[in-house]
């Protein structure tokens, strides 16, 4: 029987051939290698899938066109004890992220670990940003997530997910250490389109 990985790293990707390598390289560079990488290529029409297969054999093809549904597909396939999400245009800050996260969750034993991140548009880190609604600045205990899933809304599905998670009253540990680079204003991303007024 194949051993269960410690982390499942889920990356929903949509037409991200131009920028996904940086994030996948940041995962490949980790000195802690007890993880599985799951890339969900969702409604891709470029060569994102081809690039993803250079990094993992766990590439899932879907046609939702929705980040939340793509994340659900990754969760359904995840075998790890802990779950991390990474957006297709972001990356982990250094090669010791997984080792440090493994130490922290092993030491504190909560259901959810919140960590800080660097925000490209602002250029700073802040402890208050740990409670940001996004799912990528958190490490999740897989059994606690259980059957909780993202909604099928085009935007803000992570808000629905977080509401459902917080209703379960998780044990939370906050760690003021930046682990993640959030590429807030990559052209044509959802955040960029919101700032341009394309999305209400």
Language-model regions, residue ranges each:
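Cell-envelope/extracellular polymer assembly enzymes that use nucleotide-activated donors
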Residues: 5-8, 26, 36, 160
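Short, well-formed alpha-helical segments that are part of the catalytic scaffolds
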Residues: 15-29
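Acidic helix N-cap motif at the loop->helix transition within catalytic regions
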Residues: 18-21, 46-54
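A conserved acidic beta->alpha catalytic loop
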Residues: 26, 33, 41-50, 87, ...
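Glycine-rich, basic loop-to-helix element that forms the pyrophosphate-binding segment
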Residues: 62-78
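Short aromatic/hydrophobic "clamp" motif used to bind/position activated sugar donors
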Residues: 83
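Conserved donor NDP-sugar-binding/catalytic core segment of glycosyltransferases
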Residues: 91, 95-125
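Conserved nucleotide-sugar donor-binding catalytic segment
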Residues: 125-198
């Amino acid at each position: 029987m194949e051993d269960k990985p410690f982390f499942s790293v889920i990356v929903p990707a949509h037409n991200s051939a131009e920028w996904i390598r940086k994030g996948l390289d940041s995962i490949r560079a980790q000195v802690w290698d007890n993880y599985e990488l799951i890339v969900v290529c969702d409604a891709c029409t470029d060569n994102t899938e081809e690039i993803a297969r250079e990094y993992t054999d766990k590439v899932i093809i879907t046609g939702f066109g929705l980040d939340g549904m793509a994340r659900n597909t990754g969760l359904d396939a995840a075998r790890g004890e802990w779950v991390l999400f990474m957006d297709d245009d972001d990356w982990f800050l250094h090669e010791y992220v997984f080792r440090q996260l493994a130490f922290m969750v092993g030491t504190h034993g909560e259901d959810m670990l919140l960590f800080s991140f660097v925000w490209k548009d602002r250029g700073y880190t802040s402890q208050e940003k740990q409670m940001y609604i996004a799912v990528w600045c958190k490490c999740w205990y897989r059994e606690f997530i259980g059957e909780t899933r993202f909604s099928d809304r085009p935007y803000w599905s992570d808000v629905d997910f977080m509401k459902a998670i917080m209703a379960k009253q998780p044990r939370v540990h906050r760690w003021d250490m930046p682990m993640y680079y959030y590429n807030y204003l990559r052209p044509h991303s959802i955040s960029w389109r919101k700032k341009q007024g394309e999305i209400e």
